[in-house]
Curated annotation (Swiss-Prot):
Organism for this UniProt entry: Clostridium acetobutylicum (strain ATCC 824 / DSM 792 / JCM 1419 / IAM 19013 / LMG 5710 / NBRC 13948 / NRRL B-527 / VKM B-1787 / 2291 / W)
Broad enzyme group: ligase
Keyword annotations: ATP-binding, Ligase, Nucleotide-binding, Protein biosynthesis
Catalysis: reaction(s): L-glutamyl-tRNA(Gln) + L-glutamine + ATP + H2O = L-glutaminyl-tRNA(Gln) + L-glutamate + ADP + phosphate + H(+); L-aspartyl-tRNA(Asn) + L-glutamine + ATP + H2O = L-asparaginyl-tRNA(Asn) + L-glutamate + ADP + phosphate + 2 H(+)
GO biological process: glutaminyl-tRNAGln biosynthesis via transamidation; regulation of translational fidelity; translation
UniProt-listed Gene3D superfamilies: Glu-tRNAGln amidotransferase C subunit, N-terminal domain (1.10.20.60)
This protein's encoding gene: gatC2
UniProt GO MF annotations: asparaginyl-tRNA synthase (glutamine-hydrolyzing) activity; ATP binding; glutaminyl-tRNA synthase (glutamine-hydrolyzing) activity
Subunit-structure text: Heterotrimer of A, B and C subunits.
Family to which this protein belongs: Belongs to the GatC family.
Function: Allows the formation of correctly charged Asn-tRNA(Asn) or Gln-tRNA(Gln) through the transamidation of misacylated Asp-tRNA(Asn) or Glu-tRNA(Gln) in organisms which lack either or both of asparaginyl-tRNA or glutaminyl-tRNA synthetases. The reaction takes place in the presence of glutamine and ATP through an activated phospho-Asp-tRNA(Asn) or phospho-Glu-tRNA(Gln).
Protein name: Glutamyl-tRNA(Gln) amidotransferase subunit C 2
EC numbers, comma separated: 6.3.5.-
């Protein structure tokens, strides 16, 4: 790969958004791992698929389970590990700036 896509500052920025903390060494290691992953995508992107019929596998039959809602009776048990409640709802920290 000629250009770096992920540097230490990018890792630190993403970790801040996701509320994770990494040392400089960890951030450097992660930047290298992300670069390797993106390198694999670049390799895959170079594969010639012009002779492949992309619609060949459209008839996959996936059976889904029924999505049946159930009432959860034990609200106290459900809320026992919640850090913060507001008006009976779970309050979570803002993550989008």
């Amino acid at each position: 790969m000629s250009d770096k896509h992920v540097d230490i500052d990018t890792v630190k920025y993403i970790s801040k958004l996701s509320k994770l903390k990494f040392t400089d060494n960890e951030a450097k290691k992660l930047a290298g791992e992300f670069e390797a992953i993106l390198g694999h995508f670049e390799t895959i992107d170079k594969v010639d698929l012009s002779d492949i019929n992309v619609n060949e596998f459209d008839e996959v039959n996936t059976e889904f389970r029924k999505d049946v809602p159930k009432v959860f009776e034990d609200k106290k048990k459900l809320m026992q590990n919640v850090k913060s409640l507001r008006d009976g709802a779970i309050e979570v920290p803002k993550i989008i700036e």
